[in-house]
Amino acid sequence: MKNPQLRLLCAVALSGILAAIWLLTDYLVAIPLESRADFVGSATCAKCHEAQFHSWQGSPHDRAMDLANTETVLGDFNNVSFSYQGVSSRMFRDGDRYMIHTEGPDGTLANFEVKYVFGFDPLQQYMVELPDGRVQVLRISWDSKAHKWFYHYPPDVPDEKLAPDDPLHWTGRMSNWQQMCAECHSTNLQKNFDIETACYQTHFSEIDVSCETCHGPGSLHVRLAEAHSLFWDRHHGYGLPNLKDKNSKFEIESCAPCHSRRHRVFPDFRPGGDFLDYYEPALLREGLYHADGQILDEVYVYGSFLQSKMHAKGVRCTDCHDPHTTKLKHEGNRLCTSCHQHPAGKYDVPAHHHHQPGSPGAQCVECHMPATHYMLVDPRRDHSIRNPRPDLSVELGTPNACTGCHLEMEMEIRDRGDSQKWPHYADALAAATRGDATAEQEIARVNHQMLAATEKWYANTERKTSEKLPHYAHALDAARKGKPQAEELLTAVVNNKETPPIVKATAIEHLANINSLSSRALVVEAMGDENPLVRGVSIRNLAQQSPNAEDLITAVAPLLDDPVRMVRTSAAQ
């Protein structure tokens, strides 16, 4: 070819064609669609994600569980005795081993080696491995703030000695690590219970909550990263779920399995999966939640967060929490005002919170996310992020943040012994529920004081008017107490388009117990709801209202093909 320009043009064209072929090949060569990732360990992740790995180290996730050794054990094992309900236990060292001398499964005192520790703040728990492979969590725990031993008694039996054959005894099934705790404290847990020998051979990839608990197993991601391709895989993306997707559902539902009260629908959940394909959250049932949806029992945060306006608006966990340290992203009211950037001075001023700046009452979370103490020393905040409602407290007996704070302050100031008998608001509420007249009177008195204060603050305002409107607390309270207006109130909750799905599902469950023609029609209609939790709960509860099996099958059969496993399972049952 004599024309140099033509030669150059051909060379450029050929290079372009070859580059295009190479790029197309690079794109088309993909990992098979059915390939499934395996766990590679956090040390592998750290090679490329060093900053995130170091942020995670020392976090509550990193220290969720550990082997008991000099670096992890916080409790005093220097031959220290602790007595509770007539049982004297002794914590001591045997060389490098941490030991406890306490009542065993047969009721006699014996020595047990502490093999594992749980957590570090505000308490640390200790675990013993029994000969059959069962790992049991001791009720004697270490208060890491007060630096003392305490007995973590079950909330409903605070003053009883637990017999060795009681399921709540530390050797019983309710304190069994494999059944009650393990999958949320370790990564890739395999319980491995052998039915023939009735023994456990439990294994995990990593002892703590590591990278792959939240991001999913990383082998495909590592394989793709090491391939140095110009593209991520056309089948598997970058080999991990996209938790930063615009839809907050993917992130929230990756946290939910371990931060919710739920039961399993199907095994082997992996991050990025649909929560309701693997779990069903507990509804706002009596004993778990107060009638207005505030947390009561140890329900964690997912169920309350589902009720919040924040969830409805797309707020996600990492808007407030650093995902690696788990710490809050901002201190004080900046946590809220970093998003609620309304005209200056609208919220973080006495005109809004009516308290001295810098005091507890001036903190957003104290009013809108009150804490309830669990395990005696562990305060956990309600994530429904609601306005305090002393009016509902007076009317229905539900708690409110104002009464909680002021009642605890009064008990400390008076020092009449109430602060020992009821160290926290939740303890006073529980005492009142058990029939303690003094607790009931004290709570009622402060409730009325708080109602009077808020009525004065918000007289003739929009908030004053809004609080006269029905709240789903009225419906759930009426249903729990069997009041005649329950059906009407529940129907209004179900028909309200702004009702959070978890509340709607709870109302459906109550309507099924009423068993009238109108309530049955509403349950049938709810089987077509856009929310799968509502659909699944409706199916399960329709059976209570359908004496005719043929009618029931006709109504339920189409939902055997529902895209969500929880709904299909409910239909099959």
Model segments located where?
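Amphipathic alpha-helical scaffolding segments comprising HEAT/armadillo-like alpha-solenoid repeats
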Residues: 483-495, 516-528, 546-560
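Conserved hydrophobic register position within alpha-solenoid helical repeats
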Residues: 507, 538, 571-572
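Primarily the internal scaffold of c-type cytochrome electron-transfer domains
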Residues: 26-29, 43, 51-119, 123-130, ...
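Local sequence-structure signature of Cys/Sec-based thiol-disulfide redox active-site neighborhoods
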Residues: 36-47
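Short inter-helical turns and helix N-cap capping residues of alpha-solenoid HEAT/ARM repeat scaffolds
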Residues: 497-500, 530-532, 563-564
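Hydrophobic membrane-insertion alpha-helices, especially the h-region
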Residues: 9-23
